[in-house]
Amino acid sequence: MRLESYVQGRWIAPGGDWAGIRSAVTGAMVAEVAGGGLAMGEVLDHARRVGGPALRRLTFHQRAEMLKRLATYLNERRDGLYTLSHQTGATRADNLIDIDGGIGTLFVYASKGRRELPNATFLIDGAVEPLSRGGSFVGRHVMTPRHGCAVHINAFNFPCWGLLEKLAPAILAGVPVVTKPATITSYVAHALVRLIAESGILPDGALQCVVGPTGDLFDHLTGQDVVSFTGSADTAQLLQRHPVIAREAVHFVAERDSLNAAILGPDAGPGSPEFDLYVKEVAKEMTVKAGQKCTAIRRALAPREHVPAVIEALSRRLAGVKIGDPAREDVRMGPVVGLAQRRDVLARVEALKAEAELVFGDPARVAVEGADPEAGAFLPPLLLHCADPLRARQVHALEAFGPVCTVMGYDGLDEAATLANRGEGSLVASLYTHDPAAAADLVFGIGAYHGRLVVLDRDCAKEQTGHGSPMPHMMHGGPGRAGGGEELGGVRALHHYMQRTALQGSPAMLSRITGSWIRGAPEAIRPEHPFRCHFEDLEIGRSFHSAERTITLEDIEHFAHFTGDTFYAHMSEEATKGHPFFPGRVAHGYLLLSFAAGLFVDPDPGPVLANYGLDSLRFLKPLQPGEAIRVRLTAKEKSPRNAQYGEVRWDVEIQTAAGETAATYELLTMNAMRGA
């Protein structure tokens, strides 16, 4: 299978000499790649000129719907990816992480795009900022898609997940992608991109794939582009030093080496649920993907007195791991990705042995099921023990990217934190303790050095997603050695592909620009109640001003006894004497809300289908018996949901008869479309 690049809407064979890619399992040739023949400047230009405008014309909801259709399409055709992926050394369980996990990430971003983002082409970021005394000059931040290209350089270990977890937020943000898979597993990524291209779901130029060397691609980057890199620290540093990256201030997101730790708490001795969970997670992280995960546990920290028990329990569990042909159902660990990778892992283990003793596993003796241990890149799990981790250096600095972990003891939580932080920046650490005080000490002792912390105990053991699984909802990345970048994290990931801009102007102007009504902007008052308007007919700024209603003592007492809310401030003038907030007996805040609804609601059947919530409720002025209130209701924002209805966000202000603001909130309704 000769691998082509998918650029400018077609598959193009590279120039230059072909080089083979061998199966990690059998050593047989599975694919060929070559370099050269691609005009990288034209590839980037196609993304910027064709893909970018096509994506930016779509709203977040339309892009989200596109991601959902793509995820469904891939999910129905993933079996072929499974077959290919076995050649990389991946078991079926490994493929659940890589292939199903990647498709699942598309589904998550599709859902978040529909639920958490507006049906617009830009984002409003934060609240309105008053910039003048009289309120005629205000500020607001917006985020718009960059007019460049997202260049994604991926690692070999997750050819599907790595591609899709970067693709999803970029496409949702409205930025086209040029993806560059790692060569040794590029045949899996190539098959994935072929499926995406065949689906016809993404617009032309939204995704291009460069197989093989990137050539002079970096020479053509601009300040509107984004580079997202996953791989070794050495390669990341080389790319970040490229003169164009510095000159153009190209946004660079890096995820690099990481010496992740698992920390057994002082309370979690042998026999405890947390001890068993710790052993299970460490062993799993050593063997899933043959330990070739950026989030794998490389350092297993335990109270010094529990180290012998930890080594014994881990050795017993690792001894039961069946190694062999990953296509077999009974095999739990396949080979590393290739013979060169095996040599690299063994060389690094030898370096680690200068500070640590190999306590389980023998690289010269690997029992392999259904495959030739010499032809394939097989390794056994290798467990080391470092007796003096405070004085050691290599165990905190050198990553053997395979089924390798080092156990080390600590004396006290301060020392545990010191050892964890010796990794100089990690993607993740996991804590195994049922003691909240110990967990808090560790979280705040190591948080500055870690991108993610997982606290595991008996209460979450059955449903926890594991130390090494980055969830699309949560940020993935880490400081220092880990690269200083961030990926995923829900809609936070979109911010890498968007430009934040500060807008300043009058409330009227900014309301029109952003489609979000700002207090101080003109209101549109019509004879017809705004609740009688279908979604399409309701204009932003459409307002209703109610009549007044006086709050009586009888109202307050009836509400108190009817609801059971007999808080003293509503019931006793004497009890409120000297109160710092209340001048005397006051009305319930929720009584105000109820009266407000009675003042502004149009009761007859109509376009308003439901009120489904309140946001940002604040009670600003207490009201006493005898005071009157009135309500201003203004359509603030609209967002279509489907062909039948859309969401309307109303700005509501409850005022006193004197015009003082008593309460503010945002009311959410679903309004029907015409003809629905």
Locate each region found by the language model.
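Catalytic strand-loop segment that frames the active site of acyl-thioester-processing enzymes
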Residues: R526-A587, M673
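Hydrophobic beta-strand-centered segment that forms part of the acyl-chain substrate-binding groove
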Residues: G578-A587, L591-K636
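Rossmann-like NAD(P) dinucleotide-binding subdomain of oxidoreductase/dehydrogenase enzymes
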Residues: L117-L277, Y410, E463, G485
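Conserved C-terminal structural/oligomerization subdomain of aldehyde/semialdehyde dehydrogenase
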Residues: V25-A31, E65, S199-D204, G223-V226, ...
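ALDH superfamily catalytic-core signature
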Residues: L195-G200, Q224-V226, D234-L390, L413-D414, ...
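HotDog/MaoC-like acyl-thioester-processing domains
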Residues: P530-E539, F619, L623-A676
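Short, well-ordered beta-strand elements within core beta-sheets of diverse protein domains
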Residues: D17, M29-G36, G52-R56, P130-L131, ...
